[in-house]
Amino acid sequence: MARVTVEDCIEKIPNRFRLVLMAAHRARNISAGSELTIDRDNDKNPVVALREIADETLDMDSLKDSLVNGLQRVLPSEDEEDAAREERGQQMEALPAPPVELDEAEMLKALQNDRDGAPDGRL
């Protein structure tokens, strides 16, 4: 088959940016195992995607919807954020208390016990 040019595809999708997005999305779909609508003819996925667009063998509306769904980000609702905040608060409450400050004499005694191997209930 003759080489596919952007001019062949611009007639089908007039906006070059949208054309690139649609062709790239279709090429990714082909890479993911989507069924081809034309013969591959030993072409790579981007070329096959452009040929499919130029030959109008694709349903452009479903391809556009698939592209939009793939680009959308799902933002958490306020209820989910509140629940996550509450859960983090409960986790913070479950943390052990901060270490107790020791004066110099208690610190010296603890260090000597560690050195001498005196049992203090630790494993």
From Swiss-Prot:
Tell me the Gene3D superfamilies matching this sequence: 3.90.940.10
Q: What is its EC number?
A: 2.7.7.6
* Purpose of the protein: Promotes RNA polymerase assembly. Latches the N- and C-terminal regions of the beta' subunit thereby facilitating its interaction with the beta and alpha subunits.
Quaternary structure, per UniProt, is: The RNAP catalytic core consists of 2 alpha, 1 beta, 1 beta' and 1 omega subunit. When a sigma factor is associated with the core the holoenzyme is formed, which can initiate transcription.
- Gene Ontology cellular-component annotations: DNA-directed RNA polymerase complex
- SUPFAM superfamilies given for it? RPB6/omega subunit-like
Reactions this protein catalyses = RNA(n) + a ribonucleoside 5'-triphosphate = RNA(n+1) + diphosphate
Q: What does the record give under GO molecular function? A: DNA binding; DNA-directed RNA polymerase activity
Kindly name one Pfam family recorded for this protein. Answer: RNA_pol_Rpb6
Which biological process terms from the Gene Ontology are attached to this UniProt entry?
A: DNA-templated transcription
Gene name, per UniProt, is rpoZ
Q: Where is this region: Disordered?
A: 72-100
The signal peptide here is none
- Enzyme's top EC category: transferase
* The protein's name: DNA-directed RNA polymerase subunit omega
Q: Which PANTHER family match?
A: DNA-DIRECTED RNA POLYMERASE SUBUNIT OMEGA
What organism is recorded for this protein? Maricaulis maris (strain MCS10)
Family, as annotated: Belongs to the RNA polymerase subunit omega family.
Q: Does the keyword Aminoacyl-tRNA synthetase apply?
A: no
Q: Which UniProt keywords apply?
A: DNA-directed RNA polymerase, Nucleotidyltransferase, Transcription, Transferase
Which cysteines pair up through disulfides? They are none
